[in-house]
Amino acid sequence: MHEAPRGFLEGEALRPRPFRAGLGHLGWIFAGGALGAAARLAVEGAARRLAPAAYEAFPWGTLAANAAGSFLIAIFGTLIFERFVGERARAFWVLGFLGSLTTFSSYALHTLRGWEASPLLGGLYGGGSLLLGLLAALAGLRLTRRLL
């Protein structure tokens, strides 16, 4: 079992350890990416089924996937910086699964499409996504520190 560095549980900043991804990690990244992409598709599909009219007007499925991914990546990021999670888990969860679940390109595209339809809608989505993502990441970080 790994121990947390001194000061971490009190909220001190940590220096991230470098990720040494190599060809041996590709399988883990691919597997995580496949599951992350499937999870994103499931979230988008659920959003479309639950409220088709709202889904067409506002990309809340993407918003939900990105917020959930921000929360989870903060948890895994905290664990990784603590060295509780090994390189394979980092490749699978962070680069693969969460990298596929959350995509900046989808965020940018939805923000631009919203802006074209209505600058207010585009601004709300773009700003709201950024704020919600940061708040979700902060919640994940604090929850992880509290539980450790």
From Swiss-Prot:
InterPro entries according to UniProt: FluC
Superkingdom as given in the UniProt entry: Bacteria
Note the Pfam families from the entry: CRCB (PF02537)
Q: Does the keyword Cell membrane apply?
A: yes
Query: What keywords would UniProt list here?
Result: Cell membrane, Ion channel, Ion transport, Membrane, Metal-binding, Sodium, Transmembrane, Transmembrane helix, Transport
Protein residues bound to Na(+): 99, 102
**Localization (cell):** Cell membrane
According to Swiss-Prot or TrEMBL, what is its membrane topology?
Multi-pass membrane protein
Molecular function (GO) terms listed? fluoride channel activity; metal ion binding
Membrane spanning stretches = 23-43, 61-81, 92-112, 120-140
Cysteines paired by S-S bonds: none
Can you state which reaction this protein catalyses?
fluoride(in) = fluoride(out)
Give the chief site where it resides. membrane
- The keyword Ion transport belongs to this UniProt entry's keyword annotation: yes
The UniProt entry, under PANTHER family, shows:
FLUORIDE EXPORT PROTEIN 1-RELATED
Of which family is this protein a member? Answer: Belongs to the fluoride channel Fluc/FEX (TC 1.A.43) family.
Describe its function.
Fluoride-specific ion channel. Important for reducing fluoride concentration in the cell, thus reducing its toxicity.
- By what name is this protein known? Fluoride-specific ion channel FluC 2
Upper taxonomic lineage: Bacteria, Bacillati, Actinomycetota, Rubrobacteria, Rubrobacterales
